[in-house]
């Protein structure tokens, strides 16, 4: 099986990001900040996380205080950028809860902006108190294949944001079976307030 089967259809995180259909899901805002409803099929989320875990240099596992219903996504020490503002904590760029399906990702601020404006995410509650970097987002879980594609793209942006140039230029990351033309920089336009 192609570990990057869906990475061929990445969506640009920019003004062209499609709007998420329907109302924003209800969330409980607090230190945990979870999505309360409007979840898709649990299997789609688990398959997406399995796909992301297979990407190069990703270490996945529960947090020390976690459970089997929580997956922490970290990049390997040798390829992690030294900028702490791109991580939730340590080298963790993403976290997924399965009990109350919720996705947490650290995104570049321009991507976070478009994810919020287009209805795909909201800032993590703890960011307003400086407890997590401002790019940490609660990304709404996918309800169908089109939404899986958007979430996959958001995971991809978060993952690349956490890598050093060396990590993005590694042989494994650039392997031909990946099926994606990679850019070593993330370039999204920043929206101007009007």
Segments predicted by a language model, with ranges:
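Charge-dense, helix-prone N-terminal extensions
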Residues: 1-194
């Amino acid at each position: 099986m192609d570990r990057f089967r869906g990475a061929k259809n990445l969506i640009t995180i920019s003004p062209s990001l499609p709007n998420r259909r329907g109302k924003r899901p209800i969330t409980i805002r607090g230190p945990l900040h979870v999505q309360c409803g409007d979840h898709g099929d649990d299997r789609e989320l688990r398959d997406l996380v399995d796909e992301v875990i297979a990407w190069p240099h990703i270490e996945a596992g529960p947090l020390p205080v976690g459970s089997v219903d929580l997956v922490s996504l970290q990049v390997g020490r040798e390829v992690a950028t030294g900028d702490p503002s791109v991580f939730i904590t340590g080298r963790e760029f993403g976290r997924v809860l399965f009990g109350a399906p919720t996705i947490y990702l650290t995104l570049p601020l321009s991507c976070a902006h478009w994810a919020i404006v287009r209805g795909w995410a909201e800032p993590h509650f703890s960011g307003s108190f400086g407890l997590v970097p401002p790019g940490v987002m609660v990304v709404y879980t996918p309800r169908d294949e089109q939404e899986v594609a958007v979430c996959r793209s958001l995971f991809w942006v978060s993952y690349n944001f956490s890598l050093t140039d060396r990590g993005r230029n590694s042989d494994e990351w650039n392997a031909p079976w990946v099926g994606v033309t990679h850019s070593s920089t993330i370039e999204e336009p920043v929206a101007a307030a009007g």
